Amino acid sequence: MKVLFRAVASLAVISAVFMFSKVIEAKPFYKGKRVVMLINYAPGGGADRSGRVIARHLPRLLEGNPRVICKNMPGAGGLMAINYISEIAKPNGLTVSNFSGGYTYQMLKDPALRVDLTKNPWIAGVGGTSIIYARKDTKPGLDKPIDIWKVTNPRDFKIAGFRITGTKDMRERLTFQMLGVKHYPVTGFRGTTKSRMALLQNEVQAFGDSRAAWFKTIVPNMINTKIAIPIYHYDKFNADGSVSAYPDLPGIPTVSALYKQKYGKMPAGMEWEAIRWIQSLQGSMVRNTTLPPGSPKAAISAMRKAYSKLAKDKKYKADAMKSLGFTPEFVDGATVAKLLNWALNDNQKVQNWLLAEIEKWKKKKW
């Protein structure tokens, strides 16, 4: 009888331990933790503004309801933070990105990028475009987008940029080169805020911003005050191969529409193919979210679920509309990974041409 009692008691203890372990396993990964959202540009830019809106809602949607704080790490055209999250940040699931661009550095084999972005566990991407605007007093005077062809001296139309292999710099150079507009690229600015200040002080005459900055910063401070006018926004490249305008930017021509207005036909050639290559990624992951390589599967899964909820969340959408002036369009992490593989592996002709073009830009006496 004692033997039977001991056996039953032992089974009860084992069962209790098993049940307790299950309870522990069921505890949400992020319960009681703090997450740092790393932003690769300075405060005030589109990446910063969009990241802070997400950070306000992520704790509510992420299982375990952790604290989420934002940390800006600008530098090297966004590269400092990109290298940091893959090289230095602990793979414990507690550092998540809200990066702007970055993938072009790998597409073009920039040695400053020391990591392989395809090894990152991608969480989500946010698609979008950029709007290029210019000072109205650019010689001989700009009243409408087509007036940019009136510029006769490249140094009268200086365009601010960050890094020659960065998305912003490449797209602007390619576009104005394709359009046949005289221009003078000025690279090396440390972030959007300093670039805008340079434009306000007439050190440069043109710059490009995302919609996150356009609606809430540029329109009230530069467009409505008659300092600048919008020149174009980048086309949306659709899955069927067509291009279209972004519906929330009425009255601002796309690159293809502006080209057609001037030349009477759609753009073609290697510049256009390179713009398509870059903007196809930008249209799905102008902002991109990842964790450090080697992060726990539980963290990756929980974060992906949270971003999936975020994309449909009414409170987030309302906040985004109020804070950014538009509602971001999300794509899932699997789509981001596929796009990266496509860009890196299936476009060798465009990639090689653009690498050669960048070498020409470096040698050109502007």
Predicted features by range, described:
Residues 29, 60-65, 84-95, 106-206, ...:
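Hinge/capping helix and adjacent helix->loop/strand transition within the periplasmic-binding protein
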Residues 31-32, 224-230, 240, 250, ...:
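An extracytoplasmic/periplasmic, membrane-proximal ligand-sensing/linker region
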Residues 92-99, 204-211, 229-231:
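Paired acidic/hydrophobic, glycine-rich loop segments that form the ligand-binding mouth/hinge
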Residues 66-83:
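Early extracytoplasmic/lumenal segment of secretory-pathway proteins
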Residues 1-32, 360-366:
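Short, low-complexity disordered leader/linker segments with a strong preference
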Residues 37-52, 74-77, 160-167:
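Extracytoplasmic "Venus flytrap"
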Residues 33-42, 68-71, 95-96, 156-161:
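Short, well-ordered beta-strand elements
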